[in-house]
Curated annotation (Swiss-Prot):
Function: Monomeric heme protein which primary function is to store oxygen and facilitate its diffusion within muscle tissues. Reversibly binds oxygen through a pentacoordinated heme iron and enables its timely and efficient release as needed during periods of heightened demand. Depending on the oxidative conditions of tissues and cells, and in addition to its ability to bind oxygen, it also has a nitrite reductase activity whereby it regulates the production of bioactive nitric oxide.
Organism: Thunnus thynnus (Atlantic bluefin tuna)
Membrane spanning residue stretches: none
Assembly mode: Monomeric.
A GO cellular component annotation in the UniProt record: sarcoplasm
UniProt keyword terms in alphabetical order: Cytoplasm, Heme, Iron, Metal-binding, Muscle protein, Oxidoreductase, Oxygen transport, Transport
Protein name (record): Myoglobin
Protein's gene: mb
Length: 147
């Protein structure tokens, strides 16, 4: 619970501008881990140089962060939020679990830079994301998806 609270203390700047911060997160994810861009069919044809500032990338980044905000505010009681997310990402999008770990680390960096997430907050965010990803992975296993 304390970890969720520590992250939520710095969530305000993210919530105030989901589109910009979301765009930064996905842009950095695609630059640091180019293989992840292929997992998003609508972004697969966008050149690396054109990712930053792309409206569709920013819009999807906003969607990702809004859902994460819901998960954070649930403070661990997130089964009802996570189950449909796991279902779509396992059965429709086929996103391997490791990609959630990659985006988590990118999020830690962006929140440090843009929302003032200090070292303790970064540890808290890693802990929170670890909980969410473990629960996501448990849902994946129930669905028979070994991503």
């Amino acid at each position: 619970m304390a970890d969720f609270d520590a992250v939520l203390k710095c969530w305000g700047p993210v919530e105030a501008d989901y589109t910009t911060i979301g765009g930064l997160v996905l842009t950095r994810l695609f630059k640091e881990h180019p293989e992840t861009q292929k997992l998003f069919p609508k972004f697969a044809g966008i050149a690396q140089a054109d990712i930053a500032g792309n409206a569709a990338v920013s819009a999807h980044g906003a969607t990702v962060l809004k859902k994460l905000g819901e998960l954070l505010k649930a403070k661990g009681s997130h089964a009802a939020i996570l189950k449909p997310l796991a279902n779509s990402h396992a059965t429709k999008h086929k996103i391997p679990i490791n990609n959630f770990k990659l985006i988590s680390e990118v999020l830690v960096k962006v929140m440090h830079e843009k929302a003032g997430l200090d070292a303790g907050g970064q540890t808290a965010l890693r802990n929170v994301m670890g909980i969410i990803i473990a629960d996501l992975e448990a849902n994946y296993k129930e669905l028979g998806f070994s991503g």
